[in-house]
């Protein structure tokens, strides 16, 4: 990712090490965002403060990068067909889907990352990206924003993820959770026994056993 980014912007006269430090500075600012402005605005404020205001004229080039060259990072990302299988089955059963990925990227980049995983971005009701979110994981404000936008109570939702710190923290709000352990991220070495957890195949079996909301809705209509 960073090597592709540097390669893209060296022709514009940017120092690659300075650029990468600037990206990290902007990313840190987003991670500490307080809900007052979007992550996008927070990133560009911090990035421009670090790099100089002239960097703002290259904003369209960054958009192009995330739409095109960013895809070169696909080879570094794991893939399982079960990601598509599970999301499609949930959709077919009538569940609303939200791609609750850490909103540190623009929409174009996040949609590409979903495609790398074999998942159609259009299957989701909405996707959390830096244009619309004002918090990042693991700030609980991030999950509160999702609940507000989805108009759902915590008990009506399930957060599925592989990061113990960033995804399972949703349980603090009363959101049910499922920790996928195939590519487990547990930077703080937390005890995962308190969370429902299993492999992607285990999760697929879990999804198969979930009731169909379509059938429940049809039954209520008949009554």
Ranges and model annotations:
Residues 10-13, 52, 94, 118, ...:
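Glycine-centered loop/turn motif at secondary-structure junctions
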Residues 31, 72-74, 97-98, 129-130, ...:
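Short, contiguous strand/loop micro-motifs
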Residues 14-67:
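A metal-dependent, Asp-based hydrolase signature
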Residues 1-21:
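Active-site neighborhood of HAD-like aspartate-dependent phosphohydrolases
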Residues 38, 42, 56-60, 67-98:
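Short, acidic loop-to-helix structural element flanking the phosphoryl-transfer center
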Residues 27-41, 70-78, 133-142, 171-176:
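Short amphipathic alpha-helical segments at helix boundaries and their inter-helical linkers
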